[in-house]
């Protein structure tokens, strides 16, 4: 069977499963999620052993530290996945809810009912936990999902998908509502992108090259989880110690993830007080600074060799590493102009104690999450109370930001009549 034929087979099965999922009760869907949590606990040794095979192969292939970090499963991450299953199971079921209702002069009762999207294809790289996060959200929302993870995580994803399908069957739901693509290579992805007769939406989550490739190839709607070029802007009135903690957390905690900080913008009136603190604390944690000409002399507290002159290509760059671009700006206007030019609509942060400035930044910074005096690392479905996320949409249709259960549904009009006909 060719890759195209295999993708068509998966697509047809998913389409049938999606119809079955529209009949699934909230109790059956929740049973699948809670059963999955139990199975993940029981199968943890086997899943971690499969992950160890992937990590060994990735190291042998010379993968960098950021990719190895995203690939790695630990007992703590397994516990997070189990907690996500339980949390999503306890969320309200959006399917079938009537959001609004009104009566027309002719007596017709009109409403909008929330329904599943249908079949969702998820194309992602490296992170095996996405296999579970994506699947549980799709199941809760009554969708079928086709999962295509990166080839570097094939053993991990296979073990997780088998566990997932077992939980589905135990709950009386079709195993084909959550299928994993095991065919390697770009030909399978390209074929998947053409199955608009089966797939209702495709979600690419990974590097810029992957997202662009899927967006250009897809014949169905795309929800893009694009790159995270996240900025923090520091106003002169900010609490600098608090701002330092926010910048440190955003850059150092997990530098390889999409909500990590990539660029620090500092108002000129705060630069001389703030940048030495940044250089000392983040420099000691191993951060390399790409500083503009104004910032360079203010960062001499960094370890030797950790501050280098900024190049044009350092702006708008997602480093996936302990690297931070630093720029001094004259005003909030200049900071917002910089964000508009170099940002990726992911996450933008301001540190200020001025309410009017904070509200202006919230209004004008164009990103899926804009925060005041809080870390960029909070742009995450779990941290925002969604339980888990299938991705962070950086496109405004049909969702913008972290996508939880409700974002994996849509609405249809429902009309209740008593024999009315149009005049």
From Swiss-Prot:
The keyword Transport does not apply. GO terms for cellular component: cytoplasm. The keyword NADP applies. Keywords: Amino-acid biosynthesis, Cytoplasm, NADP, Oxidoreductase, Proline biosynthesis. Pathway: Amino-acid biosynthesis; L-proline biosynthesis; L-glutamate 5-semialdehyde from L-glutamate: step 2/2. It is an enzyme of class 1 (oxidoreductase). Its main location: cytoplasm. GO terms for biological process: L-proline biosynthetic process. Its EC number is 1.2.1.41. Belongs to the gamma-glutamyl phosphate reductase family. Catalyzes the NADPH-dependent reduction of L-glutamate 5-phosphate into L-glutamate 5-semialdehyde and phosphate. The product spontaneously undergoes cyclization to form 1-pyrroline-5-carboxylate. This is Gamma-glutamyl phosphate reductase. It comes from Desulfovibrio desulfuricans (strain ATCC 27774 / DSM 6949 / MB).
């Amino acid at each position: 069977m060719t890759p195209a034929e295999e993708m068509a087979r998966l697509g047809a099965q998913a389409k049938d499963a999606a119809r079955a999922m529209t009949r699934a009760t909230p109790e059956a869907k929740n049973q699948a999620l809670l059963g999955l949590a139990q199975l993940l606990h029981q199968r943890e040794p086997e899943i971690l052993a499969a992950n160890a095979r992937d990590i060994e192969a990735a190291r042998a292939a010379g993968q960098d530290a950021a990719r190895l970090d995203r690939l790695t499963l630990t007992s703590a991450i397994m516990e997070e996945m189990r907690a996500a299953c339980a949390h999503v199971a306890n969320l309200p079921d959006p399917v079938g809810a009537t959001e609004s209702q009104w009566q027309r002069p002719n007596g017709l009762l009109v409403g909008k009912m929330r329904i599943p999207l249908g079949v969702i294809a998820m194309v992602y790289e490296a992170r095996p936990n996405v296999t579970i996060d994506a699947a549980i959200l799709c199941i809760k929302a009554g969708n079928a999902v086709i999962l295509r993870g990166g080839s570097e995580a094939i053993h991990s994803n296979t073990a997780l998908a088998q566990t997932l399908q077992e939980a589905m069957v135990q709950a009386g739901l079709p195993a084909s509502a959550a299928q994993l693509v095991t065919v390697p290579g770009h030909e399978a992805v390209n074929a998947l992108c053409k199955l608009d007769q089966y797939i209702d939406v495709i979600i690419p989550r990974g590097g810029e090259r992957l997202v662009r490739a899927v967006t250009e190839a897809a014949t169905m709607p795309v929800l893009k989880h694009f790159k995270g070029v996240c900025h923090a802007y520091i106003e002169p009135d900010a609490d600098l110690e608090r701002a330092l903690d926010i910048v440190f957390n955003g850059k150092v905690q997990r530098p390889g993830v999409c909500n990590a900080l990539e660029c620090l913008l500092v108002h000129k009136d705060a630069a001389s007080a703030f940048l030495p603190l940044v250089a000392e604390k983040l420099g000691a944690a191993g951060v390399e600074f790409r500083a503009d000409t104004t910032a360079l002399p203010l960062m001499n507290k960094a370890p030797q060799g950790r501050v280098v002159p900024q190049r044009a290509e350092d702006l708008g760059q997602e480093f996936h590493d302990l690297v931070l671009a630093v720029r001094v700006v004259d005003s909030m206007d200049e900071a917002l102009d910089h964000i508009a030019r170099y940002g990726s609509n992911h996450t933008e942060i301001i540190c200020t104690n001025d309410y009017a400035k904070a509200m202006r930044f919230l209004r004008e910074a164009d990103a899926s999450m804009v925060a005041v005096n809080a870390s960029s690392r909070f742009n995450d479905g779990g941290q925002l109370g969604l339980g888990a996320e299938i991705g962070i949409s950086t496109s405004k249709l049909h969702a913008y930001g972290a996508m939880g259960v409700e974002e994996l549904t849509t609405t249809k009009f429902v009309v209740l009549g008593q024999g009315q006909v149009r005049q």
